[in-house]
UniProtKB/Swiss-Prot annotation:
An example Gene Ontology biological process: rRNA 3'-end processing
Residues in coiled coil: none
Keyword presence, Nuclease: yes
Keywords associated with the record: Exonuclease, Hydrolase, Nuclease
Protein name: 3'-5' exoribonuclease YhaM
Lineage: Bacteria, Bacillati, Bacillota, Bacilli, Bacillales
Encoding gene (name): yhaM
Organism encoding this protein: Bacillus mycoides (strain KBAB4) (Bacillus weihenstephanensis)
UniProt-listed PROSITE patterns: HD (PS51831)
EC number, UniProt record: 3.1.-.-
Entry annotated with the keyword Acyltransferase: no
Protein family according to the UniProt entry: Belongs to the YhaM family.
Length: 314
């Protein structure tokens, strides 16, 4: 079986086809331009540098371009990189489709839809159920395709839906332990909290922020979407305001992007569930690339820590 990019170890030679996920221009200390490219295949991605690039080269190596790369793997300041020795744009007859190079959620879309639909079916509050079903149906196609973020966690095709499914299972388990929680509110908050990402992000491949995403952000976008849905469904009840608050506060603090802190119980729990699932995804993916007895590369979003994989963990 062909080796995946995350399976290569430091010092190994690489000669593979990869997809350029992003390409960012920089200026070296000698004043010459270079490109930082993130290269990917279905297993994940790796950073590489292209030095002394000309304007012509910059135009060649852009996001969503499939390239043939030869080089070796190195560890630079705790991060795994691909040192490029040769690179060229792939010919049409050498590769099939971009979708063959992107990482995808480990659960099928239809299975995720079925699971989320069941959680909505279990809701007993008609206002919460109608609002949630309406908004999910309205944006379902994008919801099932988009990543949950540009980087850090669930940044792969269908990552948004996968994040939500994992959070719903966490919400169910926590609600069983703490029956005073309003399951309808918590489930709806989980499903809707990041739905604004379908406006904030450009799409599932070579993801960037849209103009709306840069100027408004997914939180305020979703608060407005809930308000519009309530008008369309002629729902004038406190549930609308509480759902808006849950979405508005799910980052927890102003410095993390929420204008208000959680002020209802379900909003507080949603914040912790969201944080837990995001961090578990980051740790699992980093440790999945690591041998027992070794440390992961540094995980920037987790305080730039390297995590140890015990020798008794395979």
């Amino acid at each position: 079986m062909k080796k995946k990019i995350v399976e290569y170890e430091v010092g190994e030679q690489v000669d593979v086809f990869l997809l350029i996920k992003t390409a960012t221009k920089g200026l070296a200390s000698n004043g010459k331009p270079f490109l930082t490219v993130i290269l990917q295949d279905p297993s994940g991605d790796i950073e590489a540098k292209l030095w002394d690039v000309s304007p012509e080269v910059e135009k060649q190596y852009v996001a969503e371009t499939i390239v043939k790369v030869a080089g070796d793997i190195l560890n630079y300041k705790g991060r795994i990189q691909l040192r490029v020795k040769q690179i060229r744009v792939a010919n049409e007859n050498e590769v099939t489709d971009i979708s063959d190079f992107v990482e995808k959620a480990p659960i099928k879309k239809e299975d995720m839809v079925e699971k989320i639909t069941q959680y909505i079916f279990e809701m007993r509050n008609p206002n919460i159920q109608r609002l949630t079903r309406h908004l999910l149906n309205k944006h379902q196609n994008e919801f099932l395709e988009y990543p949950a973020a540009m980087k850090n966690h669930h940044e792969f095709v269908s990552g948004l839906a996968y994040h939500v499914v994992s959070m719903l299972d966490l919400a169910k388990a926590i609600s069983a332990l703490y029956p005073s929680l309003d399951k309808d509110l918590l489930y709806a908050g989980v499903i809707l909290h990041d739905l604004g990402k379908v406006f904030e992000l450009s799409g599932p491949i070579s993801t960037t922020y849209t103009l709306e995403g840069n100027l408004l952000g997914h939180i305020s976008i979703m608060v407005n979407e809930i308000g519009k849905a309530a008008e369309e469904l002629q729902i004038d009840a406190e549930e609308v305001l509480i759902l808006q608050h849950i979405v508005l506060s799910h980052h927890g603090k102003a410095e993390w992007g929420s204008p208000k802190p959680p002020l209802v119980k379900e909003a507080e729990i949603l914040h912790y569930i969201d944080n837990l699932d995001a961090k578990m995804n980051m740790m699992d993916r980093a440790l999945g690339r690591t041998k027992p007895g070794e440390y992961t590369e540094r995980v920037f979003a987790l305080d730039n820590r390297s995590f140890y994989k015990p020798t008794f963990h395979n």
